[in-house]
């Protein structure tokens, strides 16, 4: 993407940011699983779901929220509050809204070029939830 085509995250809806953030988290989890675990594709997918489901993202957001900057917290809340009445099959409305807010934050960080911050937050959650760390 050239400079003139850059996306300004402030112009995107919270749900568009969450759409991007969902992909960011999924890619980070998949990459880490492939790097550190020799599993079949089916098992890799099952492990990925443990990190990217709405319930998992709710737990992850709860862990990371104390680390959010003021701006990050505002973006998270914007995403959480934009989440409508629809909910994931296996998540409460609270979990679904928080996971949408978390995805919104990841999308915002990614599109703002704050990849180091994305990786910093991911490392914190990975250390907490990686099954090999237990």
Q: What are these regions, as identified by a protein language model?
A:
Residues 1-134:
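Double-stranded RNA-binding/processing signature
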């Amino acid at each position: 993407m050239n400079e003139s085509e850059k996306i300004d995250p402030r112009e995107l809806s919270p749900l568009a940011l969450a759409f991007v953030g969902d992909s960011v988290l999924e890619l980070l989890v998949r990459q880490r699983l492939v790097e550190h675990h020799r599993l079949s594709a089916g098992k890799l997918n099952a492990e990925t779901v443990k990190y990217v489901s709405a319930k998992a993202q709710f737990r992850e957001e709860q862990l990371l929220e104390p680390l959010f900057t003021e701006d990050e917290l505002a973006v998270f809340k914007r995403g959480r509050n934009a989440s409508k009445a629809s909910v994931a099959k296996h998540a409460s409305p609270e979990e679904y809204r928080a996971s949408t807010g978390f995805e919104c934050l990841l999308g915002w960080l990614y599109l703002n070029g704050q990849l180091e911050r994305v990786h910093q937050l991911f490392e914190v959650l990975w250390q907490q939830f990686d099954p090999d760390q237990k």
